[in-house]
From Swiss-Prot:
One of the Pfam families matching this protein, by short name: Lys
Disulfide-bonded cysteines: C25-C145, C49-C133, C83-C98, C94-C112
Main subcellular location: secreted
C-type lysozyme domain ranges (all copies): 20-148
PROSITE patterns in UniProt: GLYCOSYL_HYDROL_F22_1, GLYCOSYL_HYDROL_F22_2
One of the record's GO cellular component terms: extracellular region
Protein name per the record: Lysozyme-like protein 1
């Protein structure tokens, strides 16, 4: 009887991370409120396009890379340089746990993405952006989303 009670209690304590996949327009509104539109010269369309090609708007996206590092969250931010997972050698330049980049609250992910754009070569950090968004008309990405 005690074992059943303990198991029930443990079941309540386990946190399950449910994948959150945003819509294009919901992200446009979140990104707009976070002042990403024209941040460092990159339009809102750049951010929406990049997030689509990096994670398909999935906050819990993870990609294991050949070098042993992992890309996390909606922006696919790398553990080797930008966030802390479990490895001690990581630089953690965003001063954030990688798990914080995979929540429905995009605050930490947006702050870190801004830091990446500011401290590196803009949005060139993201291969999805370079291949699919750079130099293109991105006005369609926010069309119909009720953002300016």
């Amino acid at each position: 009887m005690k074992a059943a009670g303990i198991l029930a209690l443990m079941g309540c304590l386990v946190t399950v991370v449910e994948p959150k996949v945003y819509t294009r327009c919901k992200l446009a509104k979140i990104f707009s409120r976070a002042s990403l539109d024209n941040y460092r010269g990159f339009s809102l369309g750049n951010w929406i396009c990049m997030a689509y090609y990096e994670s398909h708007y999935n906050t819990t996206a993870q990609t294991q890379l050949e070098d042993g590092s992992t890309d996390y969250g909606i922006f696919q931010i790398n553990s080797d340089t930008w966030c802390r997972s479990t490895k001690l050698q990581e630089k953690n330049r965003c001063h954030v746990a990688c798990s914080a980049l995979m929540t429905d609250d995009l605050t930490d992910a947006i702050i870190c993405a801004k830091k990446i754009v500011k401290e590196t070569d803009g949005m060139n950090y993201w291969q999805g952006w370079k291949k699919n968004c750079e130099g293109r008309d991105l006005s369609e990405w926010k069309k119909g989303c009720e953002v300016s």
